[in-house]
């Protein structure tokens, strides 16, 4: 009988623990996925080559795919974008960004948090806020750029329609970070009336063509040091 009673207590404990986990899922948030080999290669490169720069451009594939030094030839600009990166990924490599002692850091990140990791707006904004704080503590002024949406008609992944509303919500909250040495730049010139990326600025629904990068440059040029 004592063994049966003990078994019942164990089962009850397991049931209550499971119920608590269901009731409070945030207490057991999924860990971030491991970094890709490309992420590790790029982050390692950034650590190995840390020449001083006026500006660091930080982000995911949209940032990674641009030739920023050619776009702003009068400034020492380094590309610190990594294809597929997320807010958590950027937080993991802040030291490599600050190693170039940038006067100003331009950040645009977030779409992969929603599309690949299915995170909430609250979680992404929380990480974004920590990122801005850490960059400021490292001596850089920060320019937060609105996160660009995707084009649902052209994007290969079907979740684009679900991602764009979350990007809009994130951007509304990012604008509130513009205090003190932090500025916010809206890239609304690249966004269509339906809230997606403009048809004429992308071939695959996510990444920009040359005209898209021209408009991006025009939007941020006034904020260059």
Task: Place the predicted regions along the sequence by residue.
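Oxyanion-hole/transition-state-stabilizing segment in secreted/luminal serine hydrolases
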Residues: 58, 63-78, 88-127, 134, ...
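N-terminal secretory targeting modules
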Residues: 1-56, 68, 99-100, 157, ...
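A short helix->loop->beta-strand "cap" motif at the edges of active sites that frequently abuts
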Residues: 138-140
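Catalytic His-Asp segment of secreted/periplasmic serine-dependent ester chemistry enzymes
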Residues: 149-225
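Short beta->alpha junction loops
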Residues: 80-85, 188
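N-terminal post-signal-peptidase region of extra-cytosolic proteins
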Residues: 39-44, 86-92
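Short, basic, glycine/proline-bearing loop/turn elements
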Residues: 30-32, 76-80
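A general structural detector for well-ordered alpha-helical segments in enzyme core domains, enriched
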Residues: 93, 124-131, 163-166, 170-174
């Amino acid at each position: 009988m004592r063994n049966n009673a003990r078994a019942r207590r164990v089962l009850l404990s397991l049931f209550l623990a499971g119920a608590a986990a269901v009731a409070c899922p945030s207490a057991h948030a999924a860990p971030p996925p491991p970094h890709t080999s490309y992420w590790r290669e790029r982050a390692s490169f950034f650590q190995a080559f840390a020449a001083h720069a006026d500006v660091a451009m930080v982000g995911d594939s949209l940032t990674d795919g641009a030739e920023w030094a050619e776009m702003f030839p009068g400034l020492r600009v380094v590309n610190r974008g990594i294809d597929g990166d997320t807010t958590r990924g950027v937080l993991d490599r802040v030291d490599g960004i600050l190693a170039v002692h940038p006067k100003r850091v331009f950040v645009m990140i977030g779409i992969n948090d929603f599309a690949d990791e299915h995170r909430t707006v609250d979680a992404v904004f929380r990480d974004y806020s920590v990122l801005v704080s850490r960059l400021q503590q490292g001596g850089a002024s920060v320019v937060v750029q609105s996160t660009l949406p995707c084009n649902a008609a052209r994007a290969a992944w079907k979740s684009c329609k679900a991602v764009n509303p979350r990007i809009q919500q994130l951007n509304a909250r990012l604008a509130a970070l513009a205090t003190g040495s932090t500025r916010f730049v809206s890239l609304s010139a690249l966004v269509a009336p339906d809230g997606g990326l403009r048809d004429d600025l992308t071939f695959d629904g996510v990444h920009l063509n040359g005209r898209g990068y021209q408009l991006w440059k025009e939007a941020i040029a006034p904020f260059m040091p």
